């Protein structure tokens, strides 16, 4: 295979309350090796000032920028999808709709659903383990005409101690400056049809376990892998919930190795 053919298109999808900006360390590392990299702001995230989270009622609306990108790809192009944290649900939506346009999907300490339960199942399991104290003062508010939506806005303490505890303080400060309210869309996802084996289930999946994650714990990550086994599992030692800040070079190396394995 020629060097040119080995060049990949990585699509990077952020988690809740974050934006495309959180990939600022990983993106140039991949691009320096000649790969194409697209980092997206999902709806009402990052620098998308056209909407706020209270304008978004479904995960599909929230994920629309990713869906638009996938639609725009030529039929003969396949991408490497990379989703962090809640971004795993956006990946699953894209995988279910565009399985033929994805070489592999990489779940980076991310919610990874299955095909036997509702799309919200792995989130519900996570939410059941969270106490009010566990949110450390984060703002959770209902919204929508029937109050079925639930927005979340991470507190400083939550980000410092549960997300960024091993990451550089400069990146924590960046996150505190740029964070925006988001949603996990649990109620809405619980009413959706299951993801399909023909769509979502047909795309190869890799999972990157972050062993010092203080929010999506290693136990929960491994439970999701046991619940719906990934094709490849990679562990990152001494890594918090934000590996793109904590260990960007190692994360980039893992993404390249995964792409080499599946593309």
Swiss-Prot record:
Domain of life (superkingdom): Eukaryota
**Would you tell me the Gene Ontology cellular component terms?**
cytosol; vacuole
Q: Is Hydrolase found in the keyword set?
A: yes
The UniProt entry, under Gene3D superfamilies, shows: alpha/beta hydrolase (3.40.50.1820)
What is a GO molecular function of this protein? hydrolase activity, acting on ester bonds
Q: How is its activity regulated?
A: Esterase activity is down-regulated by salicylic acid (SA). Down-regulated by agrochemicals Paraoxon, 3,4-DCl and Profenofos.
Identify the keywords attached in UniProt to this record, alphabetized: Hydrolase
Question: Single Gene Ontology BP term?
Answer: salicylic acid metabolic process
- Quick check: keyword Oxidoreductase in the entry? no
Reactions catalysed, as given in the entry: methyl (indol-3-yl)acetate + H2O = (indol-3-yl)acetate + methanol + H(+); methyl (-)-jasmonate + H2O = jasmonate + methanol + H(+); methyl salicylate + H2O = salicylate + methanol + H(+)
Look up the signal peptide feature and give its range: none
Pathway(s) served = Plant hormone biosynthesis; Lipid metabolism; oxylipin biosynthesis
Q: What is the active site of this protein?
A: 85 (acyl-ester intermediate), 213 (charge relay system), 241 (charge relay system)
Could you say which EC number(s) this protein's record lists? 3.1.1.-
Entry's Pfam families?
Abhydrolase_6 (PF12697)
At the top of the EC hierarchy, this enzyme's class is hydrolase
Q: Please describe what this protein does.
A: Methylesterase shown to have carboxylesterase activity, methyl indole-3-acetic acid (MeIAA) esterase activity, methyl salicylate (MeSA) esterase activity and methyl jasmonate (MeJA) esterase activity in vitro.
**UniProt-listed PANTHER family:** METHYLESTERASE 2-RELATED, METHYLESTERASE FAMILY MEMBER
The record's similarity note reads: Belongs to the AB hydrolase superfamily. Methylesterase family.
Its protein name is Methylesterase 2
Q: Write the lineage as a comma-separated list.
A: Eukaryota, Viridiplantae, Streptophyta, Embryophyta, Tracheophyta
